[in-house]
UniProtKB/Swiss-Prot annotation:
Cystine connections: none
Sequence similarity: Belongs to the bacterial solute-binding protein SsuA/TauA family.
InterPro entries: Solute-binding_3/MltF_N
GO CC term, one of those recorded: plasma membrane
Organism: Brachyspira hyodysenteriae (strain ATCC 49526 / WA1)
Protein name as annotated: Putative ABC transporter periplasmic binding protein BHWA1_00430
Amino acid sequence: MRKTVKIITSLVLIACLFLLASCANKGSSSSGDATTLKVAVMPFLNSVPIEYMINNKLDEKYGFKIETVYFPSGGPMNEALGAGLWEVGTLSAASVYSLANYNAHVVADIGHSEGGIEVLVNPDSDILTVKGVNKDFPEVYGDAATLKGKTIAVPTGTISHLNVIHWLRAINVDPNTVNIVHMEFPQAYQALKAKKIDAAALNPPTSFSAEADGMKIVSSLTTLNIPQYDSIIVSDEAFNNKKDTIVLYIKAFLEACDALQADPNMAAQELLNWYTKNGSTSTLEACQSEVQTRPFVTTEEIKNIKTGDSVRITADFFASQSLITEDKLTVVDQNVDTELLGKALN
């Protein structure tokens, strides 16, 4: 009897492995049709142009078809890239992992993502008594004396962590003289309000809520002049096998960005609709603030942006924090492409 059970169990396991392998093979291959793209979307602003493209049939206009694949955030989206489940997507800081670990390619920077990446303090913080100690950053607050012994909460290994490190560097503060603690954004903000910490590194929408509640910005990617972009990321397979379609996708994406950027009220409503569609709660006012501080890159603006610069800034930071190895920096550089954008603009 036991032998029979073992045989049956083995057969079941083999069948499961076969099914998994079949699924993996299906996922790892591109869409059979060279003009169809599996496009990753997330419940954030950077996917609004994709929704606009679909609703306004821009994919049909340019002769290709979008099939969306939904992900809740950049982490799962990257893991799915490794399994070949999508071909084109839009990512910010997480794109470093796409390029370094999955040999994906960044082909265009299409949205400003530095807006709202801020370090905030209570309005009575002594950090606010010192401003512009570094003349290159006149809107940045704090110095070695006011930061000594302070506790700063931030989700480590994120773009907000990069903001903290560059803030300390800008005002010549040794990171060893402050306490940097890992804390997710909502918890960090609650701790700041309760004055259990001295500063919180936040991102939208939490940073906007903090500002509305009277918290003060002491550092941000904007005041530190650190550009960050949401970028169009392409899987290695699609990059090598669907270049003509990717060029058409970039054209359509930029047309969507032009339309959204030309009408901020429409863009805010589109964002609110997107949030609602994906189960998030927001207000039109909050969406208006977000599209104002995180504008889309237009066809004209993109001509003056050096593709991949912000990816390299983030990659350098990730390497300094041992989130990627130093040898991956070369891989990131090699996977920055400007050829397809050039074709899309011509």
